[in-house]
């Protein structure tokens, strides 16, 4: 039986992941910030905001660290601090948990983001690309991965999952992207040429578990579908799937003014390819954006 420790296990990605893992021979310990009672024999919740929580954690084989304040909220100075500290502090806390334990985890899967890569209209980024931080979001990613890599001191295999734009039917980015189309004001954002490197939630969960279970999976992995789309075509495809028009245009200056720094998520994007997943033989269920949207959207 595999023993999992998961942070962020009650969020969108975490909930899908827990639902998949509990169907296997496993026990799941989920760290939360509030008291929660489990009604499933394979799941235990621990409130890690309480003193002495560390003593409740059993020996662990696999750590999955998904904790972090949402990016889908206006980036005030206080929220930017929360975005950074929530990720770094949770990772450091996990490191300190195992630092004094004899039993070390075999694998750490640490969430990350494609914000590691600089915005570019022409470059196709693979995991071979290396860079230093160049803006606030890349600084978060850089520090998050740096703290996660400390687990290598334990002999733990560390996987850094650089998530793409996650498409799910229960919240997240797709819900926000659908709203303007439901209001008949969907269309091009900025130049419309910026890349959206997306991934269906089912493929994301499968990709996470694939890297955890594959002994040769280590280091950064781009968890994005093989065929990214430029925003204008992405929006057009979304509109067709929803049977709505794609006719308006929101200029970059307007988006910057309304959204502030958060606008970087939709304007300053990257074309990211999952080369390492392909090299290890992973097969995507949803390569094509229209197929992914047809599966998720309830018109």
From Swiss-Prot:
InterPro entries for this protein: DUF1731, Epimerase_deHydtase, NAD(P)-bd_dom_sf, SDR39U1
Superkingdom classification of source: Bacteria
A Pfam family of this chain: Epimerase
Coiled coil region boundaries: none
Annotated family: Belongs to the NAD(P)-dependent epimerase/dehydratase family. SDR39U1 subfamily.
Protein name, entry field: Epimerase family protein SERP0438
Lineage: Bacteria, Bacillati, Bacillota, Bacilli, Bacillales
